[in-house]
Amino acid sequence: MGSRSSTRIPVPPMLIIRIVLTLSCIRLTSSLDGRPLAAAGIVVTGDKAVNIYTSSQTGSIIVKLLPNMPKDKEACAKAPLEAYNRTLTTLLTPLGDSIRRKQESVTTSGGRRQRRFIGAIIGSVALGVATAAQITAASALIQANQNAANILRLKESIAATNEAVHEVTDGLSQIAVAVGKMQQFVNDQFNNTAQELDCIKITQQVGVELNLYLTELTTVFGPQITSPALTQLTIQALYNLAGGNMDYLLTKLGVGNNQLSSLIGSGLITGNPILYDSQTQILGIQVTLPSVGNLNNMRATYLETLSVSTTKGFASALVPKVVTQVGSVIEELDTSYCIGTDLDLYCTRIVTFPMSPGIYSCLSGNTSACMYSKTEGALTTPYMALKGSVIANCKMTTCRCADPPGIISQNYGEAVSLIDRHSCNVLSLDGITLRLSGEFDATYQKNISILDSQVIVTGNLDISTELGNVNNSISNALNKLEESNSKLDKVNVRLTSTSALITYIVLTVISLVFGVLSLVLACYLMYKQKAQQKTLLWLGNNTLDQMRATTKI
């Protein structure tokens, strides 16, 4: 599909700004038009906005696991709270041990261990084996340990508060939010209500809620409880720990409501445990989320191909899976550096490949420039749903219409059939029943035929056949070459030597000289002969005149 020279764009913030400013100056045109391509078996399945991101923002969420009960209800909830506290300690102690072992690899006091750790990184760089990720991880680990130490200094005040969520800023180098899902429950059920509850009911409610939260903790930290390795926590796990209070931290870190749902679906928001204190039952988690640069004029268009009918058999179009369009420029997009959601594409770098003029012309609507590869596989897709309608190859599969009853036939030469609610309300394909609600308006091209010249060979079997034909042609050429060699072998090489050639040239020149001299001599003799003839004729005429004069006398 053309040359594979790539354009790579790194993601420093200044470069992101430059890209945004540059692309904002380009006139935005409409997205890739799939209407002329659908009948040729090329279906535009959707567009996504392209964004560049780098994981540069961090914040801390301090989960308060043990709630504070109102003074008048402490006695009622004492038993379930004590049991919950013991279970928490047993459950999260392995997690705390793993965090402690990780922190022992580097200290924040500038001591010997830190120097040894940083020296190991520098040594690795000198040996050429360290990566940017390793250095970034080391820096993040130092920062996490500093935040954990600062949080521990404030643990008593955090544990004593009755607020379900509040910002912690004293001595912290980054935004930190203390949340308490269980404290929120206690506040809603007991602190902020005038309803009087008996002690038995309080015990039951607190016990049930604590058990449910323990189940969530087990689900979130299950792998880390059974394994000493610390793994990242997903955004879903963070929401399980913090409840709806997680939005407060994300808002503080600058995540807008319009981005929140998309970022949650991308999985780019993660958390790493950095602290567990069994005395106050405080859990510290460092949250990492991306810094996103929106490329407003750039979109990714996804393409799918159907098996179409040609005079050479079934074939599929040779087009990229994903293309990107900025203004009038269309290039193939490499999505291996990207994470996709329903509406967005988040990429660490933008890598595009230029397309050949033929593919560019094809995607621009000139279906006669599209190239196809023969596909004879049984699993080749013969149909596809598009906006409530169906594009199907009714020569490859039976298109049975249930309402109104009938078989949809595909005309000879047509690549695919475009079926909408005007031609069939209920369609059955390979046992799958579809109720059609969309329509293909007049802007969709129909009755497109694929020429033989547009079908090329790419399959292994077809390539073997074509190679056989090429081998036959080569064999015929070799036979002709052998005949030519045999004729050349009959030529006396000595007659074609350099000395002989010089002799031939000299003799030829001499022959030409003699020929010219002979021609000159012949011309001279002819001229002399004609002169003699004129002299004789004159003498004869003169003698005749004298005789006539004598006779008259």
Curated annotation (Swiss-Prot):
The inactive precursor F0 is glycosylated and proteolytically cleaved into F1 and F2 to be functionally active. The cleavage is mediated by cellular proteases during the transport and maturation of the polypeptide. It is a single-pass type I membrane protein; Single-pass membrane protein. Its main location: virion. Keywords: Cleavage on pair of basic residues, Coiled coil, Disulfide bond, Fusion of virus membrane with host cell membrane, Fusion of virus membrane with host membrane, Glycoprotein, Host cell membrane, Host membrane, Lipoprotein, Membrane, Palmitate, Signal, Transmembrane, Transmembrane helix, Viral envelope protein, Viral penetration into host cytoplasm, Virion, Virus entry into host cell. The record marks R116, F117 as: Cleavage. Residues 1-31 form the signal peptide. GO terms for cellular component: host cell plasma membrane; membrane; viral envelope; virion membrane. Gene3D superfamilies: 1.10.287.2480, 6.10.10.110, Head and neck region of the ectodomain of NDV fusion glycoprotein, Newcastle disease virus like domain. Residues 142-170, 466-491 form a coiled coil. Disulfide bonds join C76-C199, C338-C347, C362-C370, C394-C399, C401-C424. One of its GO terms (biological process) is symbiont entry into host cell. The chain crosses the membrane at residues 501-521. Residues 32-500 are extracellular. Class I viral fusion protein. Under the current model, the protein has at least 3 conformational states: pre-fusion native state, pre-hairpin intermediate state, and post-fusion hairpin state. During viral and plasma cell membrane fusion, the heptad repeat (HR) regions assume a trimer-of-hairpins structure, positioning the fusion peptide in close proximity to the C-terminal region of the ectodomain. The formation of this structure appears to drive apposition and subsequent fusion of viral and plasma cell membranes. Belongs to the paramyxoviruses fusion glycoprotein family. This is Fusion glycoprotein F0. It comes from Newcastle disease virus (strain Her/33) (NDV).
